[in-house]
From Swiss-Prot:
This is NADH-quinone oxidoreductase subunit D. NDH-1 shuttles electrons from NADH, via FMN and iron-sulfur (Fe-S) centers, to quinones in the respiratory chain. The immediate electron acceptor for the enzyme in this species is believed to be ubiquinone. Couples the redox reaction to proton translocation (for every two electrons transferred, four hydrogen ions are translocated across the cytoplasmic membrane), and thus conserves the redox energy in a proton gradient. It comes from the Bacteria. GO terms for cellular component: plasma membrane. It catalyses: a quinone + NADH + 5 H(+)(in) = a quinol + NAD(+) + 4 H(+)(out). PANTHER family: NADH DEHYDROGENASE [UBIQUINONE] IRON-SULFUR PROTEIN 2, MITOCHONDRIAL, NADH-UBIQUINONE OXIDOREDUCTASE 49 KDA SUBUNIT. NDH-1 is composed of 14 different subunits. Subunits NuoB, C, D, E, F, and G constitute the peripheral sector of the complex. HAMAP family: NDH1_NuoD. It is an enzyme of class 7 (translocase). It is a peripheral membrane protein. Keywords: Cell inner membrane, Cell membrane, Membrane, NAD, Quinone, Translocase, Transport, Ubiquinone.
Length: 398
């Protein structure tokens, strides 16, 4: 019997969509040679809801809540991009107080996102304490969301021309009181993880991306900064009042999972710096005033005015039945969301509904590089790499 032994085949396994480390509904088809990953095939679309098409059938105000449901970890950052796009087409300037509140809540969203990511990344590699501490802080931030908008997650708080309602002084005081104790929690997380031998063994030199590769794959946000480029839209293309804020952009030099973790930790500290500056400016005399534009064709008139003026009542009725008419044109507006560059390409035909609203989600570009990042690593490293990409499926599948 000299039958030839059958050729060795690689082993194919499914990772997800029910896997606890798969962050939502990700399905990866992995080709393994023993423990070594030969190929990664991400299957997306399990959370596809047709958001871009739905937005075309809604007025600009009705389209706003769809943006909360993209990256549902930090909802207000997406609303920000959509508002900026519409405001640039309308050619309006948001009142200073409205801009300050927006920036304050965008940074709260950054804290929400980074807390979730850093602590679950630690959980993916076996550390169980950080998520418990991180979620305690996220709960406090969710309460700030709730007190501003009435909702913990899907806030629907930003408006074209500003924000929906002013913040009560007590809420501003409470956010101020949150800042310093929070920095202590970040330091505690730092002590738990940064020098931890096991955490470093699982993250150092894993998922390395050079700067050239990061640009070629269309990365943005932490993925680019981890590879050594100080690219942050808040600095390079400032929007709202970011030009006045003093903060540093942390960058890594190795482009591995560990550097990306360190950057997120430092970004949380910088976000608190920005929040403190916003609070200081909100309390200053030039920080008082309206939170939304006073043009009644764009923002609804005040209640008291509607009781006195017939015009105001008509404006209110037209705004909520027909909506804002945005001048014809096309524009791309991007914000530095916690996960990277979140962009909205808005095409208007002059009607009260967007003609087309293309959403550029940062997580989409990062997920497409899973194959390139994981090749040659071990199976156990896949979840570490996935954790450091910071992927949320709401925005990938849209």
């Amino acid at each position: 019997m000299n039958e030839q032994s059958p050729a060795l085949r690689n082993f194919t396994i499914n990772f997800g969509p029910q896997h606890p480390a798969a962050h939502g509904v990700l399905r990866l088809v992995l080709e393994l040679d023993g423990e070594v990953v030969e190929r990664v095939d991400p299957h997306i679309g399990l959370l596809h809801r047709g958001t871009e098409k739905l937005i075309e059938t809604k007025t600009y105000l009705q389209a706003m809540p769809y943006f909360d449901r993209l990256d549902y970890v930090a909802p207000m950052n997406q609303e920000h991009a959509f508002c900026l796009a519409a405001e640039r087409l309308l050619g309006i300037e948001v009142p200073r107080r409205g801009q300050l509140i927006r920036v304050l809540y965008s940074e709260i969203g950054r804290l929400l996102s980074h807390l979730l990511n850093v602590t679950t990344q630690a959980m993916d590699v076996g550390a169980l304490t950080p998520p418990l501490w991180g979620f305690e802080e996220r709960e406090k931030l969710m309460v700030f969301y709730e007190r501003a908008s009435g909702s913990r997650m899907h806030a629907n708080y930003f408006r074209i021309g500003g924000v929906h309602q002013d913040l009560p002084p007590k809420l501003i005081d409470d956010i101020d009181a949150f800042c310093d104790p929070f920095l202590k929690v970040v330091d505690d997380l730092d002590q738990l993880l940064t020098g931890n031998r096991i955490f470093k063994q699982r993250n150092v030199d894993i998922g390395v991306v050079t700067l050239k590769q990061a640009w070629e794959w269309g990365f943005s946000g932490v993925m680019v900064r981890g590879s050594g480029a100080a690219w942050d839209l808040r600095k390079s293309q400032p929007y709202d009042v970011y030009a006045e804020m003093e903060f540093d952009v942390p960058i890594g030099k190795n482009g591995d999972c560990y550097d990306r973790y360190l950057i997120r930790m430092e970004e949380m500290r910088q976000s608190v710096r920005i929040m403190k500056q916003c609070i200081q400016k909100l309390r200053a005399p030039d920080g008082q005033g309206p939170v939304v534009v006073t043009d009644n064709k764009i923002a609804p008139p005040r209640r008291g005015e509607m009781k006195r003026s017939m015009e105001a009542l008509i404006h209110h009725f037209k705004l909520y039945t027909e909506g804002v008419h945005v001048p014809a044109g096309e524009i791309y507006a991007a914000v530095e969301a916690p996960k990277g560059e979140f962009g909205v390409y808005l095409v208007s035909d002059g009607s009260n509904k967007p003609y087309k609203c293309k959403i550029r989600a940062p997580g989409f570009a990062h997920l497409q590089a899973m194959d390139f990042l994981c090749r040659g690593h071990l199976l156990a490293d896949v979840s570490a790499i996935l954790g450091s990409l910071d992927i949320v499926f709401g925005e990938v599948d849209r």
